[in-house]
From Swiss-Prot:
Annotated source species: Escherichia coli (strain TW11681)
GO biological process: defense response to virus; proteolysis
Functional summary from the UniProt entry: Metalloprotease priming reversal component of a CBASS antivirus system. CBASS (cyclic oligonucleotide-based antiphage signaling system) provides immunity against bacteriophages. The CD-NTase protein (DncV) synthesizes cyclic nucleotides in response to infection; these serve as specific second messenger signals. The signals activate a diverse range of effectors, leading to bacterial cell death and thus abortive phage infection. A type II-A(GA) CBASS system.
GO molecular function: metal ion binding; metallopeptidase activity
Signal peptide: none
Protein name as catalogued: CD-NTase/cGAS isopeptidase
Lineage of the species this protein comes from: Bacteria, Pseudomonadati, Pseudomonadota, Gammaproteobacteria, Enterobacterales
Length: 156
């Protein structure tokens, strides 16, 4: 395992691994300046039994509407990236959830975040919700309408 990967676990010791390339891309969107706008996209990767591996993300595009504390993903490129990777992998790489940034050091979901995740993401499989803050990442797993924060696993 690469030391730059992030690993999180749920209450049942199911893992969510964020590959190092994805960690680097997510970190590049941290809102470190007072003029930085919110960024976001889709989380894409592999389902390995009860474990999830995030291997790719879609990134902000010119059609997305972004401001300091809000984001509307309007670009069709987000879905196109999911579709392309799904086809290239013969259905092995799939949509796993959503990510976006917050202009705070230690992020947590807002009421709007939770409402949009519960209402907007309908899936029979567990989905991942991720918020990139200036110093830390908040990550949760959505199963049906229940969202639980995951714990960071220390990797030796």
């Amino acid at each position: 395992m690469n030391m730059n990967e992030l690993v999180f676990i749920d209450d049942f010791d199911n893992h969510v691994v964020i590959m190092s390339e994805v960690v680097m891309r997510l970190n590049s969107y941290r809102q470190t300046h007072y003029t930085s706008t919110e960024s976001g996209g889709t989380l894409i990767g592999e389902r390995r039994g009860q474990h999830l591996v995030i291997t790719h993300i879609s990134e902000p595009g010119q059609d997305d509407v972004r401001n300091r504390t809000g984001l509307e993903r309007k670009g069709i490129h987000h879905q196109q990236k999911v579709n392309d990777l799904f086809q290239q992998s013969n259905g092995f790489i799939v949509y796993l959830g959503e990510w976006h940034t917050h202009p705070e050091d230690f992020p947590h979901p807002s009421f709007i975040d939770i409402k949009s995740w519960v209402m907007g993401i309908v899936a029979t499989e567990p989905m991942i919700m991720l918020i990139v803050g200036r110093k830390d990442i908040w990550i949760g797993k959505k199963i049906k309408n229940d969202i639980k924060k995951l714990k960071k696993k220390m990797v030796s």
